[in-house]
């Protein structure tokens, strides 16, 4: 029904059907959607512009033009409104800002209040309240309104409006951006705008207001479609999408289109047609440009041609897809499509292993299944896009689709990018995307600028256009050229502190160096990093990860298991098979890791403990005693145990072996002489210890053998004991099979298997490899040996590299040289002792060993005359070297406990092992044998060895206990009296100079542990704290430390020992680094 020209309630609709390309503009704006062909007189709404309604409205109106310059300029309708036909401009400028009741003559009679609150165009069906409250309530009923019927609140809904409703200005060739909702509008020339505006309740005036991620803010807004003036904006929907890329514009538009009906008077004027029509006219061309940029940014260009579909529900598939998908706009417009499933929109574009661009779904599928997504999964995927999109895309505007452009580009590909495309790998390249996007924007802008906007609209819209163009240029054109190096190719555009666009390289350079990148550093091509191998099948087969070395609770280096080190050999296609292979290879990897663990720990121990772990005199003794045999044997053993351990490591739990290794309480179970006979044979046939004995044997043996019962069995035959106890766990069902072979070898040789040393190294697993050689012959109680077996089986497991063997050999040679020096010293001391100080030997029998019923400590070296007196009782018949080496079995547990936490097991071993040459020479001397083995506290021997190290070559070993005290009953005290300072220093990882401080005063045979700590601290004090001396009680660990007194005394003791040939051999033998020298006097 055409309305009379005076009708204020409705906007004049342009009778002339607009051109197809203008349909969108007319539909979106539906400028005079409800008005008759000639514009009705308008009431200028400008003075009462709703600038006060929402903070955003002010900015919005200011963008268009001054809100209050209605008279000077055509009334500026809020963005959402469609400019009315030019004929209506005069009427629009009508001075009255309020609706006249008389002016609405042709309109159904409405109360003035209603007319004030609602534009007559928003006339609702009878019975609908038009009060502001009702309007507000209706805002929340937008969904309801959309279905209630042709609400006049949205008379201009583009989908509801036919082309006949467009203005004459539509013919000017300026049309609004074909926003998604507008792109598919009907071409209906029906003159009756109201009839066309009125739709059946099924047709929602905001049919395109879908709850997409892009639309939700506006379309799902409660203020949307009911009689609020916001919905009356002609181009509400179109406007919504014009600046989809600009969030601030979106907010402003929302405020524009959904004003709060707070000011009735402003409402009337605000709703008035006059505001929107000129604004709309001026708005169309710039909006087109903006829309062009928007499309270039990624909205799919929509056909402006007439659409055959009448359904408001229909939204162009590509637009719908773009709104719904989270993919960047450029992705849509550049024509990116998944090389696997063909999808053109996806929340995230990924890259396939071959470098092709794939959608998020396909990328995730490949990631989890190591194979491409099947066709069946593709269509069901959420990001599958209708096939029509491609056709539309091809038809849409300038085609910059990746399918054509890369062929024509000159990019060499292979990660060297110049942004022009030309290879299959260019799809997804950021530089190429930038170029495509820029080309699209430029072409859009050119096509838009060809359409001349009406003068009025140009005047109104000019400032916003210039502003937007400036922003557009900055974001589009500027982004394609680095302001620093002027490059147009970069994987990522950044901004400098001034907001200028700079390339990734310049941005990173500035970020790192705080200055702009020199132009000379600019490169013509960008080398892109390939995160995925070029072909999916070519995946690295052997990736040796760096093994992180961690420290466990005991301060022992533990190499974290790196799964998949060997699993890489077979690269299964499915994650399940990969996991299975990883699990299967885990055990063998653990074996290899143990080998690495040992080495790493050896290095750590060398650094941290001053190479004490391997360079100790004890090891030297063993090496010398065994000669080259020890070395070869240790290597043989390492290889053997590595092989055997590799098998066992796979089956036995590494934790068991480790836990068994930890509690090291080595009780000397048999006199050294018992071992001496068998040492050579043991070396000859070094048993390969399987982990079999490691876990179970250690526990069972610990329980089986106590230091008390051990001596008996040890005396009976160490070999049987070894076979039985060390392999005791072989009885365990799980170990039986594994143990059988290795046990056969071990038991086959009556020789005790001197692998107990393995447990010594529990503290530093890495030193095992070396220690295997050195410690072959210090036989710790089977209990310990069990744990050692666990370690030996596991640690060496894995193949030993030739380089490792060579390195071990070099280390052993070095130690042999060091041991030679120690032996020379020991021989000198022994010579002086033989000269006349045999009583010292008598004075220092290892009564501690006797106390427990043990004969000489197991520490006596196998070689030398010591073997000559194998059966001799430790008390009197045992050779001097045996006596020297004897150690109180109870002292050993004590010491091991003390050491278990801080000191490495290798240190403990060192403490226990006697210097070989000294033993040999002493063994030949009956006097020493008669005196009985001197109690060799491991600590004393350790001090001696430490003193004999090359580092301390200038400092002779000084036994704190004077010769007389060696035979003191003080020896009855636990051997813990052995200078513990060495132990403490060991824990600190500092070489204690077993200088005088290391030995307690001559008077205190058994120095208090704290006193020993004091002495040790005293000697370390200079190293750690300079020369500061703590004299007050409580200054250092609560101990008074008369440092000078003790030092001088110990020095004098050492001097007297050296000078007087009558000095007890026990005091001097420590210098020979024979651990048998116990500070404690022999026990009677």
UniProtKB/Swiss-Prot annotation:
Keywords: DNA-binding, Metal-binding, Nucleus, Repeat, Repressor, Transcription, Transcription regulation, Zinc, Zinc-finger. Residues 23-51, 150-164, 1070-1084 have a biased composition (Low complexity). It is found in: Nucleus. CDD domains: ZnF_GATA (cd00202). Residues 245-260, 650-659, 715-725, 875-888 have a biased composition (Basic and acidic residues). A zinc finger (GATA-type) spans 338-362, 482-506. GO terms for molecular function: DNA-binding transcription factor activity, RNA polymerase II-specific; RNA polymerase II cis-regulatory region sequence-specific DNA binding; zinc ion binding. Residues 1-164, 245-283, 300-337, 372-405, 442-472, 559-595, 643-679, 692-803, 841-940, 953-1019, 1040-1084 are annotated as: Disordered. One of its GO terms (biological process) is positive regulation of transcription by RNA polymerase II. Gene3D superfamilies: Erythroid Transcription Factor GATA-1, subunit A. SMART domains: ZnF_GATA (SM00401). Residues 752-781 have a biased composition (Basic residues). Residues 97-106, 128-141, 373-385, 961-970 have a biased composition (Polar residues). Involved in the regulation of secreted ferrichrome-type siderophores. Acts directly or indirectly to repress the biosynthesis of siderophores. This is Siderophore biosynthesis regulatory protein URBS1. The gene is URBS1.
